[in-house]
């Protein structure tokens, strides 16, 4: 019984050391290279390793040469069994105001080995709240949107892609 306890303690120490010394910055830059063919670029950011995570401060997000947003901070937590990307409050670029209200309070993307077939997404802001899942096996996306009064007044064209629910919200379902 004592040796089992020692074995588990050493396994935990080994796992913590792997997480701490994981080359997070090079992995981040490889991820950026993977996004480039999709025309998604994050520029002028400052990347810092926080030990068990990665912090990206500042930066401008572009999609197909169009400025989408000015980001204040992203926190990436790659813990192997539980991975999280937390996006701090940010403002959309002036060109995006016809698509969404300007301020996003925050967003979170979570992947866990305890639910390996789904990625959870949650966001909130002047547009309301959004929560959903992305299915990795069935390749389906499902998002529920509770729109704010400001979004209802704006009536962006993309809201027509959502189906109205009985609760007064909207649902988007699609395959990819």
Language-model region placement:
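Hydrophobic membrane-insertion alpha-helices, especially the h-region
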Residues: 2-21
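Generic, well-ordered alpha-helical segments
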Residues: 19, 23, 66-68
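Alpha-helical transmembrane signal-anchor/signal-peptide segments
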Residues: 23-40
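N-terminal beta-strand/beta-hairpin edge segment
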Residues: 39-117, 122, 126-128, 146
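Extracytoplasmic/periplasmic C-terminal soluble domains
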Residues: 129-176
């Amino acid at each position: 019984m004592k040796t089992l306890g020692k074995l588990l303690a050493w396994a935990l120490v080994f796992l913590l050391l792997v997480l701490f010394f994981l080359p997070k910055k090079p992995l981040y830059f490889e991820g950026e290279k993977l996004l480039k063919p999709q025309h998604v670029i994050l520029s002028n950011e400052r990347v810092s390793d926080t030990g068990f995570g990665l912090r990206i401060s500042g930066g401008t997000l572009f999609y197909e040469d169009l400025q989408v947003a000015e980001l204040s901070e992203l926190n990436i937590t790659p813990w192997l069994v539980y991975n999280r990307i937390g996006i701090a409050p940010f403002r959309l670029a002036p060109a995006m105001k016809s698509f969404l209200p300007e301020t996003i309070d925050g967003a979170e993307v979570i992947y866990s080995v305890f639910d390996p077939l789904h990625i959870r997404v949650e966001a909130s802001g002047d547009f309301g709240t959004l929560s959903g899942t992305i299915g990795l096996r069935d390749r389906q996306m499902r998002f529920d949107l509770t729109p704010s009064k400001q979004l209802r007044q704006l009536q962006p064209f993309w809201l027509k892609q959502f189906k109205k629910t009985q609760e007064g919200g909207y649902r988007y379902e699609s395959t990819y």
